From Swiss-Prot:
Interacts with NKX2-1. It holds the Pfam family rRNA_processing. The gene is CCDC59. Residues 186-202 have a biased composition (Basic and acidic residues). It comes from Homo sapiens (Human). Belongs to the TAP26 family. GO terms for cellular component: nucleoplasm. Keywords: Nucleus, Transcription, Transcription regulation. Ubiquitously expressed. In lung, expression is restricted to the alveolar epithelial cells. The lineage of its organism: Eukaryota, Metazoa, Chordata, Craniata, Vertebrata. This is Thyroid transcription factor 1-associated protein 26. InterPro entries: Fyv7/TAP26.
Amino acid sequence: MAPVRRSAKWRPGGIEARGEGVSTVGYRNKNVRQKTWRPNHPQAFVGSVREGQGFAFRRKLKIQQSYKKLLRKEKKAQTSLESQFTDRYPDNLKHLYLAEEERHRKQARKVDHPLSEQVHQPLLEEQCSIDEPLFEDQCSFDQPQPEEQCIKTVNSFTIPKKNKKKTSNQKAQEEYEQIQAKRAAKKQEFERRKQEREEAQRQYKKKKMEVFKILNKKTKKGQPNLNVQMEYLLQKIQEKC
């Protein structure tokens, strides 16, 4: 067994001899930085300057939320006012609604125009009726001329031409039919070109196969038949000439 080390207290004059006139304060490690003591006061807010996300950050978030809320309220009020005084159409159907409005506007203008012409119509009829007695004394062949002119002028004012315009639905239907016709024409053209290409490839392969069969002919000994090859070359030269 290993010898047991005796405790210092059993040594003669152990503790007393070691501690005579020596202070233990001077034996601290000077390389270790001493931690300063700070009282743990209760903080008024969560977080600190080093950790972040404290009082200033929470205040900033609160201000941002209030600002965004105010912007939403203003935007909502603005859209409600716009919806009262303006017509908002979807983007994909906007051109149809605008065309319909333009058509109604033109029709209203045409309706107002004939009304203003009808006001002048009685005046023209009165002029014609006044002019008739004056022309009765003249010759018979001169008499119908002013009446015809009056009738023509009255008819020209009273009978407006009715220009039947197409509705937006009819225009959309025509556009759709045109698009379908273009697509069908493109499809037919594609099919025609495809058939021509396949036919050309088939003819090319057939021709190549015939040439291969001619040039691949061999003699009984298994050697290439040069006579057949020379005949083929002469035939090609004659065709080119």
